[in-house]
């Protein structure tokens, strides 16, 4: 199984990259984790968020293939626990070896992308800075992995 994280946004601060890299390193021996940073559409004060999301959707589609199992992070979807994420990872391992987790832009994810997603999950009803979500997802993937392996990290 390989997991790619597609993240729309500006280049994050150094501390975000360092935090993400720590969990990527911990997972690297068992689950390759790749972060692909995608630019957001240019915003203006009088612009249209729907058009921005449509532009971002076109960029997202260039990074997806038919064999990808697209999982989007969506605040309006079911909040899952770490244990539920571990169950999903177990399923992905056997059924969907190319997993792509999408972190949307500041205005959300275009409906055209939501329509092709295989799964929609939420990590919280709270709002987080998008760069921080990279670290949260990487850590939760690592934590879920340790649950599956019986490692004491989760306790």
From Swiss-Prot:
Pfam families: SPOUT_MTase (PF02590)
Subcellular compartments: Cytoplasm
Name of encoding gene: rlmH
InterPro entries: Alpha/beta_knot_MTases, RlmH-like, tRNA_m1G_MTases_N
Keywords per UniProt: Cytoplasm, Methyltransferase, rRNA processing, S-adenosyl-L-methionine, Transferase
Protein's name in the database: Ribosomal RNA large subunit methyltransferase H
One of the record's GO molecular function terms: rRNA (pseudouridine-N3-)-methyltransferase activity
Catalytic activity: pseudouridine(1915) in 23S rRNA + S-adenosyl-L-methionine = N(3)-methylpseudouridine(1915) in 23S rRNA + S-adenosyl-L-homocysteine + H(+)
Methyltransferase found in the keyword field: yes
TM ranges: none
Native organism: Francisella philomiragia subsp. philomiragia (strain ATCC 25017 / CCUG 19701 / FSC 153 / O#319-036)
Major place of residence: cytoplasm
Gene3D superfamilies: 3.40.1280.10
Enzyme Commission identifier(s): 2.1.1.177
EC top class, as a word: transferase
CDD domains xrefs: RlmH-like
Assigned protein family: Belongs to the RNA methyltransferase RlmH family.
Its job: Specifically methylates the pseudouridine at position 1915 (m3Psi1915) in 23S rRNA.
């Amino acid at each position: 199984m390989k997991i790619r994280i597609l993240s729309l946004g500006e280049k994050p601060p150094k501390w975000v990259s360092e935090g993400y890299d720590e969990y990527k390193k911990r997972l690297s021996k068992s689950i390759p984790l790749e972060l692909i940073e995608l630019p957001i559409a240019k915003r203006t004060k009088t612009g249209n968020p729907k058009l921005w999301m449509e532009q971002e959707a076109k960029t997202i589609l260039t990074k997806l293939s038919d064999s990808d199992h697209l999982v989007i992070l969506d605040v309006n979807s079911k909040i899952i626990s770490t244990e539920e994420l571990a169950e999903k990872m177990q399923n992905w391992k056997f059924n969907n070896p190319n997993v792509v987790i999408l972190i949307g832009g500041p205005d959300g994810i275009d409906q055209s992308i939501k329509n092709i997603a295989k799964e929609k999950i939420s990590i919280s009803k709270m709002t987080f800075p998008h760069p921080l979500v990279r670290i949260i997802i990487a850590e939760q993937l690592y934590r879920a992995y340790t649950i599956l392996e019986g490692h004491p990290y989760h306790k």
